[in-house]
């Protein structure tokens, strides 16, 4: 049936997965709604069937398998890990802040629902910014324990990484290495607006 397609395109846009379905002629069918801001991977299925399977994970979602129907566009949980962690109790959101030279830098901030944004919450800021490596969202028991106990976990995607391609990578290497540190400092300075404070 030429009206449906087995073709899915998975790309990272602003450090998170964006998945789209296409027909065989290359025309777009739809953008697939993912469970949240995170990483999708491992797409597979049989051409004779209408389902495609994929994995999804982020800072509040343990790696979970989903079944996607190419005809209806609906996704359902296929295999869920036996982890005592309720993702519905947490928020993982993407923001953009301004670095020293005016560059907009993406950052994912994760915390427990009901958190008082009073600037007094313990916060971990984790960044890398080097070797063309992209920091993409993934579940970690250590991070889960941190946010479960009231902590905030923030991951800025510093220049030097691979999130925006070669230009972004080059913007944080060699003579531009100072940008990496400026990006990290700007992330730390952004957070006291609502989440934590600087000492």
What are these language model-derived features?
Residues 14-16, 60, 102-104:
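Coil-to-beta-strand transition motifs
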Residues 10-14, 54-59:
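Beta-strand C-termini and the immediately following turn/loop, strongest in propeller blades
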Residues 3-5, 24-42, 71-89:
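Multi-bladed beta-propeller domains
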Residues 1-12, 197:
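Single conserved hydrophobic/aromatic residue that forms the stacking wall/gate
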Residues 72, 79-194:
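Cap/lid segment of the alpha/beta-hydrolase catalytic domain
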Residues 16-20, 61-66:
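Structural motif
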Residues 3-6, 37-55, 93, 141-144, ...:
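Conserved beta-propeller blade repeats
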